[in-house]
Amino acid sequence: MKKITALMLVLCMVFSLVACGGSAQQAAEKVEEKAEEAAAAVEEKVEEAVEAAEPAAESDVKVAMITDYGDITDQSFNQTTYEACKAFCEDKGLAFSYYKPASDADDARVASIELAIDDGYNVIVMPGYAFAGAIAATAPEYADVDFIALDVSSGDLGDDYVLPANLYCAVYQEELCGYMAGYAAVKLGYTKLGFLGGMAVPAVVRYGYGFVQGADAAAAELGVPVEIKYVYGNQFYGDADITAYMDTWYAAGTEIVFACGGGIYSSAAEAAVKVGGKVIGVDVDQAATIDGLYGEGLTVTSAMKGLAATVNTMLGKVVDGTFQGGMVENLGLVSAVPEENYVQIAGSTQFSDSFTRADYEALVADMFAGKITVSNDIDAEPAVTAVTVDYQGNIK
């Protein structure tokens, strides 16, 4: 019908040409030319309609996330990774599930990985250095499965371990967002700071040493004396002993504590609310969680890693066939725009006239441009010029 209509329109045009004095031969040539164009256009439309009507091929990508010793409600690594995987898979129409190991042990994590593979999942996502042993045991054995490990370094896997082509590991430059948090805290007017680390693993140490460097830089700019108390809880959760330790800090004048280590924030928050103190969150924006549990406005900022961004990037590469393993990628600043980076502080930061969002953006731009450098050395305490740091070892 569309072809007939098109031809009729063309004939009308031809008759108009003849009526205006055109020759019969010219008219015939015009008819043939216009008819061919109309037929081609109709054929193209039909092909487009057929393609649109055809169902998209079902992807064979099936994604499984394995939790570490926590759960998907931990408001930290597990939850962020789970939610990012789930959202990506729902958007792309991919099968997704998660598995929780029976215990905090390598053999339990191996069992969960193998169960997921037996269930048909061919992409395994794992958050945290605790997976190193399980990865070493499984990745080489399942060459047709893609493994994505977040915050797992070469050192975690072993100096002699050769990464197989199906294993991608991401680590983060925590010293950079730690620096941002320390700088922001001092610029916002806090001069008695604390750092409560979970365990002294490389990522936590980088956070802490970056925090010290950032606070030192801000103190030097402002010309104010700043004190920092620094300790590790030797665990990634809060308890009565750590809360009591934090009580002594806040009672002695500590104004704000960077609680760096999963659920260990609970001890800092419990102590802070008793005296009107503040806390800084870690890994993800913890303001909603901490403030929801302990009181509005308690969380000044959070030093964050781009876990969700990494998940989206790597799963996207799996889907489009560009996934490349056999590497440990060190993720940090990729832009002068804060939100585009793999390390940053939270959008919920309590900016003020003394440290505005524009000030933060300028800080990130200078860091990206190399005007500000931050040491990632974890073997020696960072050199400082304007702050006093009291390193107190481990609480336990």
Residues covered by each model-derived region:
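Positively charged n-region of N-terminal signal peptides that target proteins for export
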Residues: 1-9
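A residue-level marker of the well-folded mature domains of exported/periplasmic proteins
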Residues: 25-396
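C-terminal motif of bacterial Sec signal peptides marking the signal peptidase cleavage site
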Residues: 16-19
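Membrane-proximal amphipathic alpha-helices
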Residues: 21-23
